[in-house]
Curated annotation (Swiss-Prot):
It is a multi-pass membrane protein. This is Na(+)/H(+) antiporter NhaA. One of its GO terms (biological process) is regulation of pH. One of its GO terms (cellular component) is plasma membrane.
Amino acid sequence: MKLLHRFFSNEASGGIILIIAAAAAMVFANLGATQGLYHAFLETPVELRVGVLEINKNMLLWINDALMAVFFLLVGLEVKRELVQGSLASRQRAAFPVIAAIGGMVVPALLYLAFNYQDPIARQGWAIPAATDIAFALGVLALLGSRVPVALKIFLMALAIIDDLGAIVIIALFYTSDLSILSLSVAAGAIAALALLNIFNVRRTGIYILVGVVLWTAVLKSGVHATLAGVIIGFFIPLKEQDGHSPAQQLEHVLHPWVAFMILPLFAFANAGVSLQGVTLSGLTSMLPMGIIAGLFIGKPLGISLFCWLALKLKLASLPQGTTFRQIMAVGVLCGIGFTMSIFISTLAFASMDPQLIVWAKLGILTGSLLAAFVGYSLLKVKLSGQVQPV
């Protein structure tokens, strides 16, 4: 029991479980004996009905849209804490991840287009390498445990949130034609209600969660990625301590083990099972996957590092407290883990075309993400060698 307690108390444990879950998914998705069971689990229909409201999704979408909204709620709480009283609590430090995220979206997209500019069909996938999978990036970072400065973790979180927001805007503008104005109006009303609760210092977390469920449902029905609702809820829950009680910090403490040891491993298991059927060396070396690999593995760190360097030189932003520029560059490599959001964009970009394009895109995403994960982890391990953060 002591050994088990020590394992779950170790900051790296969540990352280890996530990697095991992802590896298990790859095995299950590619073994003939388990392939059918794996896909049957993901396609299991789950229906929720309350009066006239009906949400009917398969297991994969419930994990990605509902459980991951809880993960994004935790991320929102942590980023808010650092913006208000932590490593991003100045305008210049808060601007740093914003500028980094812009570079991390623009340069990978341009690099992808450099590979595929002559192919009008492949060009439609330009946004694929612009995305960062925050869950997997944080999971790999967690493998380094207490050596990671809190400010570096928060920088990655903030950058990835902005990256995700950018991806959601790109999807809405370029890959979605049926947004629901009614649902977006309900979502706007729910956000206004959350703002009023915060302004009037309502400190009962349950009320925020109740309004948050309305927000999540409206965002889901609108056609926009529903996980965005989690970040918004987290930003409105009061952080300020009164009578020794902070609603935001208390909720953060409650959510952390559930997210690390249940939600993220489930997410990894549900999304990492990429079938390698039909994959060939000639397919891997074609312009489409090569553009994605280059965008994720080279474009991401290059864009983040270049824009951060310019921001520092022009004094538009400053480094997060307790971090170095070399650590930021290493995190930039880790941001090349595109994975689930990149796969989602690829299915939208090529859904009405040759299905083989999606297979090639997934192959490029998987290869680029694995390279980014391995090299990013290795670089950070070197850059953080000997560092242990105080508890």
